[in-house]
Amino acid sequence: MATVNQLVRKPRAPKVDKTNVPALAACPQKRGVCTRVYTTTPKKPNSALRKVARVRLTNGFEVTSYIGGEGHNLQEHSVILIRGGRVKDLPGVRYHTVRGALDCAGVSERRQGRSKYGAKRPKS
């Protein structure tokens, strides 16, 4: 335990918590422009072609963002919104694309969990 004199000389350093989404800079979402849209393969033991986009954000960061849902309309120069949330089987992918916002269309024919994919309520 430190003495009072020691604490006067050198106060206790506050704990620094590390963020998992540094590019968001404490914002809930960030806007960016797609610089490359491509597919990549997941780690073992999974197998698929996962859709991802390389995005240049408004704050200058360049990050990789996962595009969830079946099918998408993104291409180079599309303006998208990203949020935090990593993809466990894709190393280096720490962000998700927000479907149904800006240039990214929602998932068509989506019936359940629609709010996560920007799909409107279907006409019954």
UniProtKB/Swiss-Prot annotation:
Keyword terms of this UniProt record: Methylation, Ribonucleoprotein, Ribosomal protein, RNA-binding, rRNA-binding, tRNA-binding
Q: Which residues are modified to 3-methylthioaspartic acid?
A: 89
Identify the Gene3D superfamilies for this entry.
Nucleic acid-binding proteins
Q: GO terms for biological process?
A: translation
- Coiled-coil spans are none
**Function as written in the Swiss-Prot or TrEMBL entry:** With S4 and S5 plays an important role in translational accuracy.
**Descriptive protein name:** Small ribosomal subunit protein uS12
The organism encoding this protein is Shewanella pealeana (strain ATCC 700345 / ANG-SQ1)
Taxonomic lineage from the root: Bacteria, Pseudomonadati, Pseudomonadota, Gammaproteobacteria, Alteromonadales
Protein encoded by which gene: rpsL
